[in-house]
């Protein structure tokens, strides 16, 4: 009887120890689960940790030379400005890129500098208006000018006038900039992106018209499969000379602003300091926004109707500084 009792006691001890281990194992598993940390999402459009200075490149957009454009696909942001005679020019922003060919590159206008200031960008151009050159000097702009630089070359497959044939590469301008200027920056990227997909609570926006003048009429059509906007100018596909691909954009911002003539040479002063209205368009929807800019060197801020700064989808952006005397159509 005593032997049987001892055996039963031993069995009970073994069972209790085994159960204890199982409970401890379960407890340890729970604790391990609690300490799991999700990796932060990273943006694809820019490297938020990079300190490299961006480059702001002036791009020719006159109709006869538009077919010679190349390298715009690599730009994170492109701005369109009204210029003299109803034509427009682009300022394309590149960060952490080594694009082999960009162009055609054209001359500076003083308002183009206001965009470069927002990014602390090195300003790349080929020539300039009197007002442009005056401000480059007066405001101590770090620039690379094709008029006195070896970072440019001529290419003319379409037999265009000489002023429409200048190209550069980011490899070349970076090398030149490294010998002249500071090439790192602490300036925060001025546009605000969301790491999660943004779907606007707005009106349908699958067919957009953004004219600048009788001469320059832009439009966008939404590609719902790829969730981007295909760009057209005067009803024609806006296509890269080298890749033959149509330019597409994830985000479109329209900022409506006034302008005035500065002199008899028809140079314009774009009223990009102050405030105004516009639209933000992405993923087939559009909302009304406001824009504001305190001074030429400050960032332009875009807000929704509730006064909250808008967040862009993680992708490239086209910003239209559309004249207030032109009508935007969104369908």
Task: Indicate where each model-derived feature is located.
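Sec-dependent signal peptide recognition
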Residues: 2-10
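C-terminal motif of bacterial Sec signal peptides marking the signal peptidase cleavage site
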Residues: 15-18
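A surface/extracellular/periplasmic glyco- and lipid-processing/surface-interacting theme
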Residues: 26-75, 79, 84-331
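Bacterial signal peptide processing site
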Residues: 20-22
């Amino acid at each position: 009887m005593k032997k049987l009792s001892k055996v039963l006691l031993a069995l009970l001890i073994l069972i209790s120890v085994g159960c204890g281990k199982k409970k401890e194992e379960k407890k340890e598993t729970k604790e391990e689960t609690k300490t799991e940390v999700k990796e932060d999402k990273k943006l694809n459009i820019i490297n938020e940790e990079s300190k490299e200075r961006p480059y702001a490149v002036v791009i020719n957009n006159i109709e006869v030379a538009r077919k010679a454009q190349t390298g715009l696909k690599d730009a994170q942001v492109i701005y369109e400005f009204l210029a003299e005679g109803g034509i427009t020019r682009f300022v394309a922003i590149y960060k952490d890129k080594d694009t082999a060919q960009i162009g055609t590159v054209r001359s500076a206008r003083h308002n183009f500098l206001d965009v470069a200031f927002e990014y602390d960008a090195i300003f790349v151009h080929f020539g300039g208006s009197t007002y442009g050159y005056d401000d480059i000097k007066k405001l101590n702009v770090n620039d690379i000018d094709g008029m006195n630089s070896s970072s440019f070359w001529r290419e003319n497959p379409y037999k265009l006038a000489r002023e429409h044939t200048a190209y550069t590469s980011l490899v070349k301008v970076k090398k030149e900039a490294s010998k002249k200027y500071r090439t790192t920056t602490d300036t925060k990227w001025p546009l605000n992106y969301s790491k999660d997909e943004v779907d606007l609570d707005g009106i349908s926006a699958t067919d957009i018209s953004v004219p600048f003048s009788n001469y320059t009429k832009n439009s966008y059509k939404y590609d719902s499969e790829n969730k981007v906007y295909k760009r057209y100018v005067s009803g024609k596909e806006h296509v890269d000379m080298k890749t033959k691909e149509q330019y597409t954009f994830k985000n479109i911002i329209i900022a409506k602003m006034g302008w005035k003539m500065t002199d008899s040479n028809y140079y314009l002063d774009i009223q990009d300091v102050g405030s105004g209205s516009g639209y933000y368009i992405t993923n087939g929807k559009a909302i009304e926004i406001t824009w504001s800019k305190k001074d030429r060197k400050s960032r332009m801020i875009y807000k929704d109707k509730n006064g909250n700064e808008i967040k862009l989808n993680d992708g490239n952006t086209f910003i239209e500084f559309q004249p207030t005397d032109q009508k935007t159509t969104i369908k």
